[in-house]
A protein has these predicted regions:
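Conserved N-terminal entry element of GNAT/NAT acetyltransferase domains
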Residues: 1-35, 192-193, 197, 206
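Active-site rim helix/loop that mediates acceptor-substrate recognition in acyltransferases
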Residues: 30-63
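Conserved acyl-donor/pantetheine-binding loop and adjacent beta-alpha core of acyl/acetyltransferases
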Residues: 58, 67, 71-110, 114, ...
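Short, well-ordered beta-strand micro-motif
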Residues: 65-67, 77, 179-183
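Conserved acetyl-CoA-binding loop-helix of GNAT-fold acetyltransferases
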Residues: 106-109, 115-132
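Conserved GNAT acetyl-CoA-binding A-motif
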Residues: 123, 130-152
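C-terminal "cap" of GNAT-fold acetyltransferases
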Residues: 153-165, 170-206
Length: 206
């Protein structure tokens, strides 16, 4: 499998639809949760789809798609943190400081491709994209599955995956829910899709 990572532009909307399926990925969210909070499940799923499509049409691209050939097999939402207002309404995820960070806030991987390195490839590509955009750091909000009573809802990723990619915990307001960051001002040392690190390793972003 050779993954190619591409930004979600309007011409790739049908690829996202195919990946998410009729249910809109996670409970019909259509990646609206961090934008509008729990209101996403109080309205028809089609309304979330329409709202997120408007985000895509308006631009800039709100995330990255991983392709295996012509098939989209993975997705991550990647934006400046301020584009996701509901993060600051989440008690455990409020801002650590005023740094102009970007947020890697959720993932979705197609069945049959899970546990095959798709998430790691998306993380590696996201680091490159955020750095080129001028972000000081890339932030994420994973679940620490090594902690008791951690949730099984892992759409934000797992802490161990991000740790392998070089992210460090900068806040932990509950044992199972750290805020992790990768400093993008340091010399570039981007992990590949397997988590291996080195200054020359890249995941193609087209």
């Amino acid at each position: 499998m050779r993954l190619i990572i591409r930004p979600l532009t309007p011409d790739r909307w049908t690829a996202l639809e195919d990946l998410f399926g009729k249910n809109g990925a996670s409970n019909g969210c259509w990646c609206m949760y961090w934008r509008i909070g729990s209101a996403y499940h109080k309205r028809p799923r089609a309304k979330n789809r329409t709202a997120f499509r408007a985000v895509v049409k308006r631009g800039p691209p709100p995330g990255l798609l991983a392709f295996d050939g012509h098939v989209a097999v993975g997705w991550c939402q990647l934006t400046p943190r301020h584009a996701l207002p509901w993060l600051d309404r989440a008690r455990l995820l409020k801002r650590v400081d005023d740094a102009p960070v970007w947020a890697l806030s959720c993932f979705y991987v197609r069945r049959g491709y899970r546990k095959r390195g798709v998430t790691s490839a998306l993380i590696a590509a996201a680091l490159s994209v955020a750095k080129r955009a001028g972000a000081s750091a890339l932030e994420d909000y994973p679940v620490d599955t090594d902690q008791p009573n951690s949730t099984s809802n892992l759409f934000t990723g797992t802490a161990s995956t991000f740790a392998r990619a070089g992210f460090k915990t900068v806040a932990r307001r509950a044992p199972h829910r750290p805020i992790m960051r990768h400093d993008l001002r340091a010399p570039e040392d981007v992990p590949d899709r397997h988590g291996a690190r080195g200054p020359t390793r890249r995941v193609p972003v087209e």
